[in-house]
Amino acid sequence: MSVLIIAGLDSSTGAGLARDLAVMAELGLPARIAATAVTAQDSAGGCLLHPVPAAMVAAQIHAAGPVRAAKLGMLADAEIVAAVADSLPPVPTVLDPVLATSAGVGLIDAAGLAAMIALLFPRATLITPNLPEAALLTGLPEATAPDRLAAALFARGARAVLLKGGHGKGAEAVDWLCRPDAPALRLASPRKPGTKRGTGCTLASAIAGHLALGADLPTACARAKAHLDGWL
């Protein structure tokens, strides 16, 4: 029943592997990890990033043994992306396309981003971009309608997209689960005041956890949204 978490280590423990592991503990699921990078992050938004060698990332994935689902977070560069693509087991996989810290510090280079789209979008069961990430991935404005953003991501190889609305406006935080062969599913919760790090990690890990528990994709997304709302 283990879930494989492939992500970076955030020294502040506010996001990344620490947050992913906390979610697995909350769900009562064992986890296996593959660290892609070590970061030094502080409360002022500073971030130093040291990628783990791609061969070591692959070795960690192979050492994990059998798992029921996987969650991918920060991947740092093209060599790591390629190692993950070559080593990833054939299980339901949630890709959180982490592009930058909450303070705007980049966490993947241009070659890594291109490799992520080419190698991992077609492999992932679901990708979970927020609105700024969806805009960067598609070249469209953040205000573009969800169905158009999703269509542009499908054209780049994505199989299913959860567009996260936490960066939007209004009384509700609205996420849209979009699939090429089904109507879009609206998932809404009351918008909480302020900001909190680790929301994307929490949601993606919770989805992966519920997929490991046997839920279908819409159910896993709905349960994960409720889990995130409870944490906030």
Predicted regions and their residues:
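Conserved phosphate/ATP/ADP-binding segment of small-molecule kinases
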Residues: 108-184
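Short, small-residue alpha-helix embedded
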Residues: 23, 135-136, 194-217, 221
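Short glycine-enriched, charge-decorated loop/helix-capping segments at active-site entrances
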Residues: 45-52, 105-110, 139-142, 192
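Short pre-catalytic strand/loop immediately N-terminal to key active-site residues, enriched for Gly-Thr
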Residues: 6-12, 184-198
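Phosphate-handling active-site elements
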Residues: 28-32, 183-185, 210-225
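Nucleotide and nucleotide-moiety/phosphate-recognizing core
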Residues: 79-92, 159, 180-184, 194, ...
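Conserved N-terminal subdomain of the carbohydrate kinase-like
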Residues: 1-5, 17-102
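Short, well-structured alpha-helical segments that form the helix of a local strand-helix-strand
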Residues: 146-154, 216-231
